[in-house]
Amino acid sequence: MSETEAQTMSKPDIDYVLVDFEPLHKQRWRSETVRLVCVQFPPHTRCLWHQHLNYGVYVVMAPLDVMEQPYGQQPRPLVKDKGSVFCRDHTIDKLLHVVTSAETPAFIVEVELLKKKEDVVAHDQVVIHNANGVELLNDEPECRVYRLTLQDDASDDKSTTEISLELPTGAVLVVLDDCEVEITNVSENAEVDTECHKSLKVADDVQLTAGKFNVKLVSSNEKKVQLILTECDYTKV
């Protein structure tokens, strides 16, 4: 079989777009290393066939109940609770699929990592964060993902209303619950030092630089506030 024949046979026989151009996958911002995508489906809605080519960290903003059909496979349910986080390495699977929502809307924020495989730097020498309110969800060469939980619970000696970390790299914070917080992010570059009081809504995001990071809960109507921290721009020491 010739190379041309092989390419023709392997090419999908459907119309599809790259995820960058799928209308329900809306880009919020893009840097050299990260693309932040807000994915929202009304009930009973089917998106276009589309392909993912990068590593993705998916943060579920509301209970998820959709049907996902990868190209060449049968449809399969994708059901997740609010606050769930799942990671997919599309540099490997080159996922081409279509998704259909059910009775409820679908709402996901994706932290899409844009680094090529050859540019990913191992971070096995970087210490994993260990503090009250911090849970490691994912540890792969491309990124580390943590769940930060802020709450004032006198019955739980591990609960905390403030978390302080030393970020080894640039990071993205995605908000799961409406809240007011004070955020400090002090980097080696004095020009980008920040200290601010923020009123954050579900699915909001905050871009962070390497350096000292502190988040303090000011108020919320929720018993606990959760935020997802993705560290994703490791560099060689």
Locations of the language-model features?
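Surface loops and adjacent helix of pleckstrin homology
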Residues: 69-71, 111, 184-188, 220, ...
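Short acidic-glycine-tyrosine-enriched beta hairpin
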Residues: 30, 70-92, 185-214
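A short beta-loop-beta micro-motif enriched in histidine and acidic residues
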Residues: 43-57, 73-74, 153-172, 193-202
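A short, N-terminal "cap"/entry segment at the start of jelly-roll beta-barrel domains
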Residues: 2-38, 42-48, 68, 75-163, ...
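Asparagine-centered strand-capping/turn motif at beta-strand->loop junctions
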Residues: 50, 95-103, 165, 175, ...
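Short, conserved beta-strand element in jelly-roll/cupin
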Residues: 51-67, 165-182, 186
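Sequence termini and other peripheral, non-core segments
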Residues: 171-172, 196-216, 223-237
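Residue-level recognition of short, solvent-exposed, well-ordered loop/turn junctions
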Residues: 42, 61, 80-81, 151, ...
